[in-house]
Amino acid sequence: YAPEAAERVIQFFKLLVFAQNRWAGKPFVLQLWQEEMIRAFYGVQVLDDEGNWVRYRRFLYNEIPKKNGKTELAAGLGLYHLLADGEAIPDVGIFAVDRENAETLYKAAKYMVEHTAMSQPPHRPMVYCRDSVREIRTRFGGLMKVYSNDVENKHGPSFSAILCDELHAWKGR
């Protein structure tokens, strides 16, 4: 177990703000169950073939009732993978049963970027949003983008992280 790996994710959330409802704009405070889930996923590591410590788990599945912060948590985790997970040029895909649902997650991440505690110089931001194509880009080539759930047509991207919202509603999953 590598507590520092999990703690890095938890500390990242302290830079973010909530994006929806009455908490919009307030600091993102993880609930205990969210912290424990992050610790269980990001903290458990194994040695790979090259002798590097890597995450043991590759899939994080979160199923809880509506209005419990799933979308905001997913948006924050997506931003973590885009900005802080250590990949040089990360590619984070946002998928949902339809484009409208995927855009809900994108809008939460966008709000977090635009209202974050991470200070960015206005003339050259590290992260910027492009609404016309529903994507968040980093100055270094990282990308977080909305895709349809038609996975068969998604040849090319080598995703660093994939965020799937409303998975229970997908046909043929």
Q: Where on the chain are the PLM-derived regions?
A:
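Phosphate/NTP-binding elements of NTP-utilizing enzymes
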Residues: 1-173
